[in-house]
Amino acid sequence: MAKATFGAGCFWGVEASFRQLHGVQDVAAGYEGGKLDNPTYRDVCTDLTGHAEVVEIDFNPDEIRFEQLLEAFFGLHDPTQLNRQGPDWGTQYRSVIFYHSPEQQTVAQAFIDRLTAEKRFPRPIVTQVVPAATFWRAEEYHQRYLEKRGLATCHI
């Protein structure tokens, strides 16, 4: 089993999308990259903690490669928007890859370089690639948020 952690705006739709991929064993919504221990949603929404809304993914690398997760990640959001996705704005909604190994760092950066060379997006990619920090699981009401409400997607 391996881990991947991505921030791509509001975590509700991101979580639901990654859950659908074969080889993904579990997805948890949470917060990462900030300076406050055990932050709450209310804390993170102040835009003062430095945390991003993220999903932490447990996946089987024999069934799905990290590159496939990256392809899904870049297809889920606009990685050229700085600190926002759609109507949501603030640093908590930044585009970020928290890598769990030097290999993930190398693969993620090479993936971004390839997307840039291919001109896949009309503006520069602003996705951060940073070492994984402490993942703080979000409150239970955020877990499987869309599923619990009978929704298939949100605005991402």
From Swiss-Prot:
<dbReference type="InterPro" id="IPR002569">
    <property type="entry name" value="Met_Sox_Rdtase_MsrA_dom"/>
</dbReference>
<dbReference type="InterPro" id="IPR036509">
    <property type="entry name" value="Met_Sox_Rdtase_MsrA_sf"/>
</dbReference>
<dbReference type="GO" id="GO:0008113">
    <property type="term" value="F:peptide-methionine (S)-S-oxide reductase activity"/>
</dbReference>
<dbReference type="Pfam" id="PF01625">
    <property type="entry name" value="PMSR"/>
</dbReference>
<comment type="similarity">
    <text>Belongs to the MsrA Met sulfoxide reductase family.</text>
</comment>
<keyword id="KW-0560">Oxidoreductase</keyword>
<protein>
    <recommendedName>
        <fullName>Peptide methionine sulfoxide reductase MsrA</fullName>
        <ecNumber>1.8.4.11</ecNumber>
    </recommendedName>
</protein>
<comment type="function">
    <text>Has an important function as a repair enzyme for proteins that have been inactivated by oxidation. Catalyzes the reversible oxidation-reduction of methionine sulfoxide in proteins to methionine.</text>
</comment>
<feature type="active site">
    <location>
        <position position="10"/>
    </location>
</feature>
<dbReference type="GO" id="GO:0033744">
    <property type="term" value="F:L-methionine:thioredoxin-disulfide S-oxidoreductase activity"/>
</dbReference>
<dbReference type="GO" id="GO:0036211">
    <property type="term" value="P:protein modification process"/>
</dbReference>
